[in-house]
Amino acid sequence: MIRLLGRGGTDLPGRIALKLCPNLLGVLAKNVTTVIVTGTNGKTTTSRMIEQSWIESGISYFANKSGANLLSGVTAEFAVHSSLSGKCRYTHALIEADEAAFKAIGKFVDPNAIVVTNVFRDQLDRYGEVTHTLENIRIGIENSPHAKLALNADDSLCTSLAGAVPNPVLFYGVNTPIYASRVEELSDAPYCIRCKHAYVYDYVTYGHLGKYRCPVCGYSRPEPEIAVSEVAVTDAEHSEVVFDDGKKRIPATI
């Protein structure tokens, strides 16, 4: 039906399909190694970085590049990449998921990994306060018990998820300042998520992201397993950085 409509990757065919078969996504996603990327900002950039690594590794995959990141759109993407019998033609799926829709997607897709980029206030009109967005993501993770998490160590909201769910966690982050910034002017999360006292920052990378610590309860940025250790060039077009995983340094252009 989705192929006949010629609108794979858009919401309408997926909505129609889900009306006919509410568990369609669960059927189509079965036995597909799936990585979900969610968060307020950076989902598309992060997805394209993962995608490039899959291309270079020769992995058979599809991705929802069309931007259809709601439950209906993700269902449509799986459908157009599956046979008429419901078997996906690819071994892997890279799914960019809207934060609010993620909690529903997790009920049907059993992802192998979930990347959470950050939680910012620019979703205010749709989702209310940042704590509500954070709760949506937590529920999505709770619905994905087999997933390994990749969490942004620089985001005090994002890292709080590690203590809220039992999933194994890998932290990533930026171990060097990028821009001069005043936290009190830019921060969406100036106060400790545990005790509500103001954070102290050793440096800021962007907004409320950076090396934070609470001087009262001790809640602080975890040490990332993989991090940007050097930013050589950054402009509107690209950034030249060095990644460090504790064993080797890897130059990269983003």
Say what each PLM segment does.
Residues 1-173, 181-192:
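Phosphate-binding loop of NTP-binding sites
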